[in-house]
Regions:
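Domain-length cofactor-binding catalytic modules of enzymes
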Residues: 1-151
Length: 151
């Protein structure tokens, strides 16, 4: 929804803007599909041929994938690797001065940067592999982060 709002604002500002929303990443949402409500918590739609974004952490790759529409999995895929440790534990363990970090984050609230440190998340690679092997997705592109914006 936010990406679409940004796209609309750009279209209003720039006469020659031809951008269009390519990938949206709802991951805690209820959507009506085929007459029923599908609740996805930590998952995102992966309908056959539909693009999805599976984000890694600030220190790990993210992936653009194409859904395979597996009905047994409610035409869904995982939204990411998941947290390895709770936010309060990361705040306790991470150096407050950012020493030794090889990632970049722009944020309004410093505690959010620390809470989202790469070590707080599980690696995304095995998640992508498992979903590919299960026939839920096919990889399209691997994206390496260079900076992250965190509200």
């Amino acid at each position: 929804v936010l990406a679409e709002m940004v796209r609309q604002e750009f279209a209003a500002l720039f006469d020659d803007d031809r951008s269009r929303l390519v990938v949206d990443v709802p991951h805690n949402v209820v959507l009506t599909e085929e007459g029923v409500n599908v609740h996805r918590k930590g998952a995102t739609p992966a309908h056959a041929g539909q693009f999805a974004l599976i984000p890694g952490s600030m220190g790990d790759s993210s992936y653009v994938v194409r859904g395979r529409g597996q009905e047994d999995w409610l035409r869904s895929c995982s939204r990411g690797g998941g947290r390895r440790m709770p936010r309060q534990e990361v705040r306790r363990l991470a150096p407050a001065d950012g020493q030794g970090q090889d990632w970049q984050c722009v944020t309004l609230r410093e505690e959010r940067r620390i809470e989202e440190a790469p070590q707080a998340y599980k690696p995304i690679g095995p998640v992508i592999e498992a979903q590919t092997e299960a026939g839920l997705i096919e990889g399209v592109a691997r994206l390496r982060p260079w900076t992250t914006f965190k509200a």
